[in-house]
Design a protein with these regions (language model features):
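Alpha-helical cap/lid subdomain in secreted, periplasmic
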Residues: 31-42, 61-211
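Serine-esterase "nucleophile elbow" of acetyl-processing enzymes
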Residues: 1-52, 57, 63-71
Length: 211
């Protein structure tokens, strides 16, 4: 049985249980888990280790306990928006785009050194204008795009699968307003999670070498 690990911040966490590994919360990871269990039954063991509020440095700090020790065969990572959000919301926290890149690089290198056979997907950080970021929207959007560019650069640097999301949400605005997809410009509603799930599955097919 192969192991799949979902890593990230609150978008991945989505209210998951800390006591019951089968309770994935209510986000895209739970939707992916349900789909994979339906289609493949007992082929995969799955863990959700997203932690609400996490930035790239937080994920790096728990790399052993929540990544390496779980020995996943496949892993997806969605991280970066909090490095921007916590810069603007009064916490004066997070790291700049260049530091984000180097911490992310160190994370991937240490994971691959410990688990040389692991296959990794990098999900693109994304945002839309909403109640959580409208006060500083233009600068916020620019900063998220910088992390998105760095996330793509990480995937290219290490030959990983990159899953684009920002353009998908931008295009979705033609169908419905931001609040239809994201609660506050950052956290997905079920419709937003469904979109992430679809893109995750496309990336996973590439990871498996399927068309």
């Amino acid at each position: 049985m192969k192991t799949i690990l979902f890593q990230g911040d609150s978008i991945t966490d989505a209210g998951r249980s800390r006591e019951d590994d089968s309770h994935f919360g209510y986000g895209y990871a739970a939707q992916v888990k349900e789909k994979l269990e339906l289609e493949y039954q007992n082929r995969y063991r799955m863990y959700n280790r997203g932690v609400s509020g996490n930035q790239i440095a937080d994920l790096y700090a728990r790399r052993r306990a929540d990544i390496i020790n779980l020995k996943p065969d496949y892993m997806s990572i969605l991280i970066g928006v909090n490095d921007v959000w916590h810069k603007f919301d009064g916490q004066e926290n997070g790291v700049e785009a260049e530091e984000y890149f180097w911490i992310y690089s160190s994370l991937i290198e240490e994971i691959k050194e410990a688990l040389p056979e692991i296959k990794i997907m990098i999900l693109e950080p994304f945002t839309l204008k909403g109640t959580g970021n409208q006060a500083y929207w233009e600068e916020f959007y620019v900063e998220v795009l910088k992390r998105a560019e760095k996330a793509k650069a990480i995937a290219e640097k290490y030959g990983l699968i990159f899953v684009p999301l920002q353009e998908k949400f931008d295009v979705a605005l033609k169908e419905a307003p931001s609040e239809h997809w994201l609660l506050d410009g950052v956290h997905p509603l079920p419709t937003g999670d469904e979109m992430i799930k679809q893109e995750w599955m496309k990336g996973f097919s590439k990871l498996l070498g399927e068309k």
